[in-house]
């Protein structure tokens, strides 16, 4: 949509175009967001009436279950998600990590290493809410003071992440199995039990095998399939209401819930584990918020998905209230008119595949986010579309999910056990979202704690009721998501814990700048042509792996760049703000530092574009740095020799911006002060890229007292030195680039506890050996790779 439309056509035309775009997004969201939620009528009633309760002539059970389904759909997806949780977005992004990122920006509870104050200057980092009040500052201070709460918060987020992964395994199994189960009405029992499982497994194998092609080629048919399915189930539901029981609307009264529990007692409470499946997929509304927007998801659910689901469930309840002795027990397909059975079966299978595809893609996305925040072992991430952001494929995870999904389908063989397992995973994710949203209400929205407590108690009690009912089915399938989440949580926490310890080891063993400056021919050190990119997690100082490299191979490249690729707690980092560049040592040393910042949903560049852009940023920095030096030298008349011994030995990291070539067109800039490791006050000025005629540049301003001893040189000499430095950079680029990475072996300190030794010596090293190396994550070509062996004692 053209943002200038309103200026050209008037506000009325602009509003019309805006609503047209929102409605289009709402339509497209059907295939991505609501596939899983829309197919739940296939198995809700069948799971609920599996064993715990029986259908009686009085219809109290049917009416009670219908009342529970209606109020659960109304309170959780509609009230909680559509009107509250969707507003807790992180720059338009949703999901567990979005909530965690939002909290970490308002409260210092992040466990991410190499955090810099300069990160707060990012445009996506801005805190738009009013200053904190007394009530939320108390909560903030309490959270920041107790370090164990930081770990507890991370564990809570990891729990939600692990349950999403478990849901990615269970949802395809139960969705496809329930859809294919419609064949039971057209087959004998003997043939049915030998046909459904193979057909389900075949569909699942095809589904996972096609993942590497991406969904962008067939994604345009997802929305029509789900729309057709919603119209189909709502139409059948309306027909059943009119045909069998027009008074089924009475079941919407909450009194039937209490009557149901009073009659069925413990059995009714245990049957809630099947009822909760009606909200399977509701979390996708928040998790996929970044692909659409708040208005589109709200409109699609409120005016289409919600009414269609209510009609579908009411239609099933109306049919079952008049058929107490069905030969095929209770299920979705018994309420479908016989003339529509085969078309509905075909649409149901297609809709189940679409719903499964959405949760599989969501699993890939959340694992990629976990990896970017250092909470998951390195895996290969393939971007399946150059046009659509976020379309990724992870081979290892895909095949693991496929094997486990088929194993679960063959092992459980019925909707009851699959529903018990899926329900527990779904409810655990919702509980995590409720807890994190209550923190957002206090810390980010600055609302009174009593409001957050009311939100937590109201929705938390509903979800705990369902969660407790799911736990009672532990031996009947609910053990699976608990086991899976435990395994994944151990893997993620061990990886994150050891990664933090490695960073602390690097921080303690970094080498001083003086050591680097002392390296020269007198010590037998030679400089070879080319650019050496030394990758490190440190944002200051010289990493120990470089000193080890020089010790074993007394040579390094003519142009040396210490590169730190780091993640910041924002979803995206604008390209104009991604690079922070600075000098390491004096000008003639040709050493630089570059910090590359990515958000947890950013797409990492391939090595060719990264290398080209990095050299471009270095060239821009060199030009502007010499321009600034010349101005300061002309104004202050300070000596270059003094500068080299003092100021240039200080590390200063700067940000990249775009500014106009013309002097009279200066963009608005924001300044933020921060201290480097030498306690020098720097000022970073960052601006948004201009729409036309712009060149990427770097602005770097230093306090005047940092150059007290600097002398002045002539403009001609400065230009000559500038050209010389740029020629050296160009020559080094033509000579080739080498990527220097550490190859780590980690072991626990002597005297460490048994748990720590198991986690570090066996757990982490096993994961490191069997997962992708850092060169794969950074997409480094093997021909340009130099690995330095490092032993970390943590």
UniProtKB/Swiss-Prot annotation:
InterPro entries, A to Z:
K+_transporter, K_trans_C, K_trans_N
**Where does the entry say this protein is expressed, by tissue?**
Slightly detected in roots, stems, leaves and flowers of mature plants and in potassium-starved plants.
Q: What happens when the gene is disrupted?
A: Plants display a short hypocotyl phenotype. Kup2-2, kup2-3 and kup2-7 are considered as null mutants.
Q: Which residues cross the membrane?
A: 22-42, 65-85, 154-174, 194-214, 218-238, 266-286, 295-315, 340-360, 392-412, 418-438, 439-459, 477-497
Q: Name one Pfam family in it.
A: K_trans
The segments annotated as topological domain Cytoplasmic are: 1-21, 86-153, 215-217, 287-294, 361-391, 498-794
Q: What does this protein do?
A: Low-affinity potassium transporter. Could mediate the potassium-dependent cell expansion in growing tissues.
What is the name listed in the Swiss-Prot or TrEMBL entry for this protein?
A: Potassium transporter 2
- What is the protein's species of origin? Arabidopsis thaliana (Mouse-ear cress)
């Amino acid at each position: 949509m053209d943002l200038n439309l309103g200026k050209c056509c008037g506000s009325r035309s602009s509003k019309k175009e805006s609503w047209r775009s929102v409605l289009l997004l709402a339509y497209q969201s059907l295939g991505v967001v609501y596939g899983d939620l829309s197919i739940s009528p296939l198995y809700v009633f069948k799971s609920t009436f599996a064993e715990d309760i029986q259908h009686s002539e009085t219809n109290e059970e049917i009416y009670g279950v219908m009342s529970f389904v209606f109020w659960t759909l109304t309170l959780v997806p509609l009230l909680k998600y559509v009107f509250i949780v969707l507003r807790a977005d992180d720059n338009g992004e949703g999901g567990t990590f979005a909530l965690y990122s939002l909290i970490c920006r308002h409260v210092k509870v992040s466990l991410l290493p190499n955090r810099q104050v300069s990160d707060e200057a990012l445009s996506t980092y801005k805190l738009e809410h009013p200053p904190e009040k007394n009530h939320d500052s108390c909560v903030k201070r309490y959270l920041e003071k107790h370090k164990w709460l930081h770990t507890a918060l991370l564990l809570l987020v990891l729990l939600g992440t692990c349950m999403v992964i478990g849901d990615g395994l269970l949802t395809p199994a139960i969705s496809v199995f329930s859809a294919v189960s419609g064949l039971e009405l057209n087959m004998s029992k003997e043939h049915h039990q030998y046909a459904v499982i193979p057909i389900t497994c075949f569909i699942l194998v095809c589904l996972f095998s096609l993942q590497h092609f991406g969904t962008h080629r067939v994604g345009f048919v997802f929305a029509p399939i789900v729309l057709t399915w919603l119209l189909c189930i709502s139409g059948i539901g309306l027909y059943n209401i009119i045909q069998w029981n027009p008074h089924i609307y009475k079941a919407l009264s909450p009194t039937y819930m209490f009557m149901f529990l009073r009659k069925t007692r413990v059995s009714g409470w245990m049957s809630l584990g099947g009822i909760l499946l009606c909200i399977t997929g509701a979390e996708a509304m928040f998790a996929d918020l970044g692909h659409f927007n708040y208005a589109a998801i709200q409109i699609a659910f409120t005016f289409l998905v919600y009414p269609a689901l209510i009609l579908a469930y009411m239609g099933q309840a109306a049919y079952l209230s008049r058929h107490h002795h069905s030969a095929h027990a209770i299920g979705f397909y018994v309420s479908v008119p016989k003339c529509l059975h085969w078309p509905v079966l075909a649409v149901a299978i297609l809709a189940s595949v679409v719903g499964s595809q959405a949760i599989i893609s969501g699993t890939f996305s959340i694992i990629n986010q976990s990896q970017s925040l250092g909470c998951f072992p390195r895996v290969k991430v393939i971007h399946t579309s150059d046009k659509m952001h976020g379309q990724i494929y992870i081979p290892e995870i895909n095949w693991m999910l496929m094997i486990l999904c088929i194993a679960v389908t063959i092992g459980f063989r019925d909707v009851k056990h699959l529903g018990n397992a899926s329900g527990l995973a779904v409810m655990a994710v919702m509980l995590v979202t409720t807890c994190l949203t209550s923190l957002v209400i206090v810390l980010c929205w600055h609302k009174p704690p009593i409001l957050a407590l009311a939100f937590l108690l109201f929705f938390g009690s509903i979800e705990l009721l369902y969660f407790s009912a799911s736990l009672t089915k532990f031996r009947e399938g609910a053990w699976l998501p608990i086991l899976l989440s435990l395994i994944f949580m151990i893997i993620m926490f061990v990886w994150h814990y050891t990664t933090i310890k490695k960073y602390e080891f690097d921080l303690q063993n970094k080498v001083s700048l003086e050591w680097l400056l002392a390296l020269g021919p007198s010590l037998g050190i030679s400089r070879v042509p080319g650019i050496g990119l030394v990758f490190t997690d440190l944002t200051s100082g010289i990493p120990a792996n470089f000193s080890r490299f020089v010790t074993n191979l007394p040579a390094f490249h003519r142009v040396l760049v210490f590169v730190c690729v780091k993640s910041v707690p924002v979803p995206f980092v604008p390209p104009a703000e991604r690079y922070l560049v600075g000098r390491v040592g004096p000008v003639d040393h040709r050493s630089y530092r570059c910090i590359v910042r990515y958000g947890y949903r950013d797409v990492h560049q391939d090595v060719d574009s990264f290398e080209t852009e990095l050299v471009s940023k270095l060239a821009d920095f060199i030009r502007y740095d010499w321009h600034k030096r010349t101005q300061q030298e002309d104004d202050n008349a300070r000596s270059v020799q003094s500068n080299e011994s003092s100021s240039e030995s200080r590390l200063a990291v700067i940000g990249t911006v775009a500014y106009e070539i013309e002097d009279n067109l200066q963009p608005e800039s924001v300044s933020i002060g921060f201290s480097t490791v030498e306690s020098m006050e720097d000022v970073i000025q960052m601006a948004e890229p201009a729409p036309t005629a712009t060149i990427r540049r770097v602005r770097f301003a230093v306090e005047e007292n940092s150059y007290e001893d600097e002398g002045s040189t002539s403009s001609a000499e400065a230009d000559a030195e500038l050209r010389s430095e740029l020629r050296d950079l160009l020559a080094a680029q033509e000579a080739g680039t080498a990527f220097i990475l550490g190859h780590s072996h980690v072991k626990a300190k002597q005297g460490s506890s048994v748990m720590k030794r198991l986690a570090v010596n066996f757990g982490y090293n096993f994961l490191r050996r069997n997962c992708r190396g850092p060169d794969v994550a950074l997409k480094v070509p093997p021909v340009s790779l130099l690995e330095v062996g490092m032993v970390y004692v943590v």
